[in-house]
Amino acid sequence: MHERYVPADVEAAAQSDWRAADAYRSKEDANRKKFYCVSMLPYPSGKLHMGHVRNYTINDVMYRYLRMNGYNTLMPMGWDAFGMPAENAAMANGVPPAQWTYENIAYMKKQMQAMGLAIDWSREVTTCKPDYYKWNQWLFLKMLEKGVAYKKTGTVNWDPVDQTVLANEQVIDGRGWRSGAFVEKREIPMYYMRITQYADELLNDLDGLGWPERVKVMQHNWIGKSFGVNFGFPYELDGEKKLLRVFTTRADTIMGVTFCAIAAEHPLAARLARDKPALQAFIDECKRGGVAEADIATMEKKGVATGFSVSHPLTGEPVEVWIGNYVLMSYGEGAVMGVPAHDERDFAFAKKYGLPIRQVIAVEGETYSTDAWQEWYGDKTRAVCVNSGKYDGLAYDAAVDAIAAELKAGGLGDKQITYRLRDWGISRQRYWGTPIPIIHCPSCGDVPVPEQDLPVVLPEDLVPDGTGNPLAKSDAFLNCTCPKCGAVAKRETDTMDTFVDSAWYFSRYAAPDAQTMVDARTDYWMPMDQYIGGIEHAILHLLYSRFWAKVMRDLGLVAFGEPAKNLLTQGMVLNETFYREDAAGKKTWYNPADVTVSFDDKGRPVGAVLKSDGQPVELGGIEKMSKSKNNGVDPQMLIDHYGADTARLFTMFAAPPEQQLEWSGAGVDGASRFLRRVWAFGFANREALAVRAPFDAAQLAEAGKTLRREIHGVLKQADFDYQRLQYNTVVSAAMKMLNAIEGAKGATPAVLRETYGVLLRVLYPVVPHVTFELWKVLGYADEFGPLLDAPWPKVDEAALEQAEIELVLQVNGKVRGALKVAKDASREAIEAAAVADGMFAKFAEGRPAKKIIVVPGRLVNVVV
């Protein structure tokens, strides 16, 4: 054993032992409790960041603790390898996305191995490999057969210069990110998955999940179940009588309708724009810019009057029709009723364009004014109808019932349940993704690729140039034969949304070599007992993976309908930011490692200079580590300098897993010092720690009993904290243990060996390398086996019992000292000890005790 702790040597030795033992390969065992813990698989961007380190360490700690407690544990890893960043990198570097992706995977895998993670690499999944995405294609075809997948036209962002479809994030201020051209909205045929068919089940099943309430609320709101009324405004055009249909949750305000707004893509808009250049120009303007709902929600609301009116369904009054840039064709009916008096968006729109505002609900004690919007204008809980004829005085529920009944009687509408959730459009007009297994035949139409011809393999040697889809230019991929009639045909060039790849990978981990999509091993491991990932995945990834599981269940592939029993959303890793701003307002961000900070006498930062030139930089505050703010810390540099165990210890100690973690160089130094202390104690006491002599706990001297009582008391708390995933307090417990062991005077070597062994096992899940090596070199492995499978230490309840207890001694209600008495001392004995104590004599000043109050186990108060 070396005197000095050298992390690189210790970690290399431990990892060598683990590789030789194939330590983390997991096998199904029906006779053992299983625990399947998964971190959301990373995108292979090139290097790990500290967010990865934190996520995977949390997973690893969980795995090791539960393995010590007898669970059959599994921690796999894979790569979410398709996606747009690879295409962008390929364009920038002139290499195929496949080459860039595989090189990144190789490097990041080495980084994970250097962290000492308990990953079963035999189950590794890479989503851009044909043996994985074959099953995306296979399930898509099954869904097509069942009607769960289907084709329809959908709206996309079209760059007219690059002649390509853009993702929402590639549209910046209405322009294409590469060409700078104004983006157009286009309708093209795309494939969809009928997730709305599962809307109620997706909502109801949230109740049974051990997920953060915040995530469940986000999914609940995204699904957005609404109870309302679907009805039509009658109109006549070109000799035909029709209805302009809308959906509303506020039918109680129908008498306040003063306009209707329709989407630019609405069929009525196109008809009304004939021979009206100004109206057509506005429609064209609306079709430019992104199609992202978030963008539309925040942009300026604009509208143009069409000069056409529909009839109010209950009064017959004319209602003017406008085209609004905020109305989405994909939501509801592509038309909305405008009630400016009681909808904030409509209120602003009406004020902007001078439209009538008609109050039709009132709240007692409130006064309505059209001068400015007030929150109560939209209140449906306290309001009653006014200015609404026969509906006056009705509260929300009664008004909706009555109005819906009248609309139904007139054949104009009825109550309806709707969802904010829309079917999942999976077609992407991109190269680097799962090919959609469809062949377009001039005679037969769209023909599914036969199952025996799967996978449709994506060529990996293409280099995108930003103009169009490379697959459409690849004759080798594009041209094929129709499997039905044998005619010359062409393949579908759209690829699948990458959320398809991440919707089921955890099921493939369970059976990575299966010749079917999944097998019996999947039902052994799934559902995941613990899933770990960022809050940013709360909606789309987690919702799609839940949908995918239910589809697989309904197809008879798996027995479960929810992929993850429990979810932990780890907090972000934050760091200081520093910048300089030029005359044009452009900020240049500097890495904290390149900056010297000065502090005031209270330790608060008051200034900073760049190390390279000594000139000031601005303090930008603490923000999430990111490339854009240049405030990241390279995990590899941290591992190279301090070792993986120090990195792991700091990330677990600095904050509870679900909270944000503020980076601290001093905290990293502190973690390193602690591990050196653990090693130094082992080295300094290596001979005493080698003593395996049994001992009778009851016969130990007081020093031994005191040490064991403290260690086993802290162990009890640490075990509880491990179970509730509070790893920061586990580390605190280990620090208390080391302090107690270092400070123990007179404890026998056997007691030191026992208590130091407890410390190593408590620390092991967090810092596996140094504890594994100490366990081995100090002889614990010879006695108990390698630390990998050493049992979790049991709390000795007898050690926690005390022969004496300490009571607070008060005189006339003021604390004057402490009193040690036998644990089972009688009230009379406690009273006698109190008046005999020197502190009582000092403060009583010769006065006799009038009354003695004893609070068992806590205090004794002598009144004089």
Curated annotation (Swiss-Prot):
User: Is Ligase among the key words of this record?
Assistant: yes
Leading EC class:
ligase
Please provide the record's keywords in A-Z order.
Aminoacyl-tRNA synthetase, ATP-binding, Cytoplasm, Ligase, Nucleotide-binding, Protein biosynthesis
Which CDD domains does the UniProt record give? Anticodon_Ia_Leu_BEm, LeuRS_core
Location of motif 'HIGH' region in this chain is 42-52
| One GO MF term attached to the UniProt entry | ATP binding
Q: Which residues form the signal peptide?
A: none
Question: Could you say which protein family the record assigns here?
Answer: Belongs to the class-I aminoacyl-tRNA synthetase family.
What is the recorded name of this protein?
Answer: Leucine--tRNA ligase
Task: Tell me what organism the protein belongs to.
Answer: Burkholderia mallei (strain ATCC 23344)
